[in-house]
Design a protein with these regions (language model features):
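His/Asp/Glu-enriched, well-ordered alpha-helical/loop segment
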Residues: 1-79
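C-terminal cap of metal-dependent C-N hydrolases
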Residues: 49, 66-112
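Short, solvent-exposed mixed-charge patches
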Residues: 116-117
Length: 117
């Protein structure tokens, strides 16, 4: 196992082709869980935090902190328990790229969450 030897393993691939279109990288995270023994949270961290470190932007890319790039996905559910949630666009509640919403959360989203709990 590469990880046991201290080698970082990150998801990624050649996207943008007919047989592997953009937007399918969440499928790779599920493969990391099912085939490589990652927990869902480890797969998410490999794709985000470790990816930011690999790209030379530790602390700014792949993390949620003040001063970091604001690229966020808010989903209905807990992907740390069920990684497949990230493959279901119907569960995407909000999408933010560079601090701008590409899909804004519903106005009543917070109220629905509080009422459900």
């Amino acid at each position: 196992d590469l990880r046991k030897r201290g080698i970082r393993v990150l998801p990624g691939g050649d996207y943008g082709f007919k047989w592997n279109p953009h937007g399918r990288n969440a499928r790779d995270l599920q493969m990391f869980v099912e085939l490589f023994g990652f927990s869902p949270l480890e797969a998410i961290q490999a794709a985000t935090q470790a990816g930011g470190e690999l790209m030379g932007e530790p602390g700014r890319l792949g993390v949620i902190t003040q001063g970091a790039f604001a690229d966020l996905l808010l989903v209905d559910g807990d992907p740390s328990k069920d990684i497949a949630i990230l493959q279901d666009p119907d569960r995407f509640l909000a999408i933010m790229k560079d601090g701008a919403f590409h899909k804004e959360p519903a106005d009543n989203l917070a109220g629905q969450r509080v009422a459900a709990e």
